Amino acid sequence: MKMRPRYSVIASAVSLGFVLSKSVMALGQPDTGSLNRELEQRQIQSEAKPSGELFNQTANSPYTAQYKQGLKFPLTQVQILDRNNQEVVTDELAHILKNYVGKEVSLSDLSNLANEISEFYRHNNYLVAKAILPPQEIEQGTVKILLLKGNVGEIRLQNHSALSNKFVSRLSNTTVNTSEFILKDELEKFALTINDVPGVNAGLQLSAGKKVGEANLLIKINDAKRFSSYVSVDNQGNKYTGRYRLAAGTKVSNLNGWGDELKLDLMSSNQANLKNARIDYSSLIDGYSTRFGVTANYLDYKLGGNFKSLQSQGHSHTLGAYLLHPTIRTPNFRLSTKVSFNHQNLTDKQQAVYVKQKRKINSLTAGIDGSWNLIKDGTTYFSLSTLFGNLANQTSEKKHNAVENFQPKSHFTVYNYRLSHEQILPKSFAFNIGINGQFADKTLESSQKMLLGGLSGVRGHQAGAASVDEGHLIQTEFKHYLPVFSQSVLVSSLFYDYGLGKYYKNSQFLEQGVKNSVKLQSVGAGLSLSDAGSYAINVSVAKPLDNNINNADKHQFWLSMIKTF
């Protein structure tokens, strides 16, 4: 039997199988795999920007102003002393000293020299380094300069949060306590990673230590908002399970004192044709801020509309675990590494024709994602991931009705990428551009396909309009930000989206003349009114610029409202 893109009783009966899901996707019939993919669009996390510079490294000498150009003398040698008055090797300062040694200098020149030495060490990771010109008698043109690199003194903790003191100590032992000196990159990493911990606010304070050249570190931690919840409503659902969706969720932080987080999300479409529940629990497990988490997801659906007579319904449950590590944390660059494992059980039924489909999918995903302040007032975001999957497929369909390439078991590999840039412009304007896509080594089951439509794709089409094995999306958006009311922001935008892809990686089983590629594009405008931590209202309208989807809507109107507590 060859695959046909038209609807038939037999096609509908076997469409829930892996290979027969090819005809299904061309027709737009949802199943557990495609519905899970649509929900994943809703679960996309907001992108985290780098914080920007944390510490001011300028080291202005207090002596520069009081030393005026006066008596000069020939400088023959500069001795650099540490805080124990021991001479240190100065090879790394040769490029600075050569501008002074062998020349006639004044006290003002020596002050400038000390300042240059301070700046050199501060720009080479010694955050509080200071070169001092101590009182001295200059003999035979030899000048002594005291170099204080900034030794770690006392580290004190003022913890008024639910975060464990033991965890903070372990985190400091892998950063600020790894050197005898206060190093800028380690202190920055400590500040950034501890502020990544949910449910806390942290601050650092440096002060002079008891000994010469020492600096004490005070760590202040207070509870932030540990409990939060939300309710939301939108019209982003599938037309066969219900356009309107109601969702609610809650999040609790620091239950065990190790930066753990528990999240619960519930969702139902109108008439309850689609129900979904998701739980995610994660906790930090070491002093390097590595996070281990477990997830569980349940979905139940029943189709209406054109597929109601088939009595199509199904359910799925997914169990997963993941490791997330902040590989690089600097003020202008973030890089995280994630490894996850998921086990999915998907069941679809068409009771009118007595067809039942079961699939079990085990997948291992490894990936990186990050952000970079590469350009002034701009942030670049990126991600790369590879998924290795194993599919076990069972169907009640008779062998003579199955398609030619039906395989009870198969392996597959999927590659995903994303690159985007957000640029702040003058007069409260901004411009966003992004590209993302997917490659696969073979034809995929519906839960692994890429959706070209929806709010994360070509916004002039519904999420299930085109589901492809390989595809690419380009999105551009021009925004304007306007403060309104007391704390709200109104964002207006114009956007253009373009997507293209291949329905099936392997097309040799398609009938001749059946089109395997698709291109979508749309333009639109949107408005968003929000108050961070309180509410958000988003409205957008998009119009397709193509006629490549049969019976496609003439436009899409997207609405979502969320209230947070």
From Swiss-Prot:
This is Heme/hemopexin transporter protein HuxB. Likely functions in the release of soluble HxuA from the cell. Probable member of a two partner secretion pathway (TPS) in which it mediates the secretion of HuxA. Probably a beta-barrel protein. GO terms for biological process: monoatomic ion transport; protein secretion by the type V secretion system. It is found in: Cell outer membrane. Keywords: Cell outer membrane, Ion transport, Membrane, Porin, Protein transport, Signal, Transmembrane, Transmembrane beta strand, Transport. Gene3D superfamilies: membrane protein fhac (3.10.20.310), membrane protein fhac: a member of the omp85/tpsb transporter family (2.40.160.50). It comes from the Bacteria. Residues 1-26 form the signal peptide. Residues 73-150 form the POTRA domain. GO terms for cellular component: cell outer membrane; pore complex; type V protein secretion system complex. One of its GO terms (molecular function) is protein transmembrane transporter activity. InterPro entries: Hemolysn_activator_HlyB_C, Polypept-transport_assoc_ShlB, POTRA, TPS_OM_transporter. It comes from Haemophilus influenzae. Its main location: membrane. Belongs to the TPS (TC 1.B.20) family. Transmembrane segments: none annotated.
